[in-house]
């Protein structure tokens, strides 16, 4: 692969993607062979949300990892200041680094 991203470059992309998702500006973002997708389910005011990390492999997007979180807030931008968001961004970055340089089939 021609793209050789550093961990700090990937983390910056992940952080900007999460912030833009929480602002409601985007639902997905792609960097090289990695895609971050966002979806949510609003059931009785309880928001169950998922950020999914996918890789381009064998001509289609394959799921790598799901990051689940819940909120009683309909406004995700209010969540960006929550302390656990930084941990989630770090976790997504770590997973992205596993796949961005070495696409591979998952074991499930």
What is each model feature region?
Residues 2-3, 101-108:
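Short acidic DE-rich linear segments
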Residues 2-40:
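Negatively charged, low-complexity tracts enriched in Asp/Glu with abundant Ser/Thr
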Residues 6-13, 89, 93-97, 101:
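N-terminal export/targeting and maturation segments
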Residues 12, 16, 55-56, 64, ...:
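Positively charged, low-complexity intrinsically disordered regions
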Residues 29-97:
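Acidic, low-complexity, intrinsically disordered interaction modules
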């Amino acid at each position: 692969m021609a793209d050789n991203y550093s961990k700090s470059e990937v983390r910056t992309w992940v952080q900007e993607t999460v912030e833009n998702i929480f602002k409601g500006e985007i639902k997905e973002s792609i960097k090289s062979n990695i895609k971050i997708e966002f979806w949510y389910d609003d059931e009785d005011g309880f928001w169950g949300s998922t950020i999914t990390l996918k890789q381009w492999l064998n001509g289609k997007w394959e799921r790598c990892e799901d990051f689940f979180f819940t909120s009683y807030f309909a406004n995700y931008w209010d969540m960006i200041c929550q302390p656990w968001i930084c941990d989630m961004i770090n976790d997504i970055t770590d997973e992205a680094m596993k796949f961005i340089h070495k696409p591979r089939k998952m074991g499930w």
